[in-house]
Amino acid sequence: MAQTELNVSQREGLGKGTARSLRREGLIPAVMYGKGVENCSLVVEPKQLAAIIGSEAGLNSLITLKGEGAFDGKVVILKDMQVDPIRQTPLHVDFQAIDLNAKTHVLVPLVVVGKSEGEKQGGNLQIIRHEVELVCLPANIPANIEVDVTALNIGDALHVQDVQLPEGVEIPQDVNFTVVTVTGRTAEVEEEGAEVVEEGEEAAEAGE
């Protein structure tokens, strides 16, 4: 995965008051931490961050921080981001410094591709999980993992251990949750339920 640069600056002052002041100025408070590195309080420019999030790698981009401070040149990933529930804009960002030669755990989006045989027969595809935890070197972090559902019939389920992964990418061995399932014909079930209700109403009327 290609790396991208992000210009940041050292944040002067801590606490909620400082963070609120930065947001009023249109900036995003952030922090960088990681094994063997000095924790740094930072300030991020929203447009630069938005460009990274909107890239192909998205939230799993490898980012090289640039600026004057101990953080300069550190390679990080976006570990956490607090978002305004109404405006959907970032309120605070956590960057985790990583070692490019050590495997890391990341959450990657799952993308369903294809139309299942069960859907063609009138079934309903239910997506149970939208992301998966992966273990890999930072350079091998994928933007997403595709889940091919074309072979699934009604009653079938696909588990995370069944998902095809890129080379150099692993799923923790103790994890095997259900990703998608194909259930029966919901339309028929609803129709049958309506018929039962109608029959019950007719029986009630006959008994009056």
From Swiss-Prot:
Keywords, A to Z, come to: Ribonucleoprotein, Ribosomal protein, RNA-binding, rRNA-binding
A GO CC annotation given for this chain: cytosolic large ribosomal subunit
**Quaternary arrangement and interactors, per the entry?**
Part of the 50S ribosomal subunit; part of the 5S rRNA/L5/L18/L25 subcomplex. Contacts the 5S rRNA. Binds to the 5S rRNA independently of L5 and L18.
Q: Which Pfam families match?
A: Ribosomal_L25p, Ribosomal_TL5_C
Give the GO terms filed under biological process for this record. translation
Q: Which PANTHER family does the protein's record reference?
A: RIBOSOMAL PROTEIN L25/GLN-TRNA SYNTHETASE, ANTI-CODON-BINDING DOMAIN-CONTAINING PROTEIN, RIBOSOMAL PROTEIN L25_GLN-TRNA SYNTHETASE, ANTI-CODON-BINDING DOMAIN-CONTAINING PROTEIN
Enumerate the GO terms in the molecular function aspect.
5S rRNA binding; structural constituent of ribosome
What does the function comment of this entry state? Answer: This is one of the proteins that binds to the 5S RNA in the ribosome where it forms part of the central protuberance.
- Kindly provide the name given to this protein in its UniProt entry: Large ribosomal subunit protein bL25
Name the encoding gene, please. Answer: rplY
The similarity annotation says: Belongs to the bacterial ribosomal protein bL25 family. CTC subfamily.
The organism of origin for this protein: Syntrophotalea carbinolica (strain DSM 2380 / NBRC 103641 / GraBd1) (Pelobacter carbinolicus)
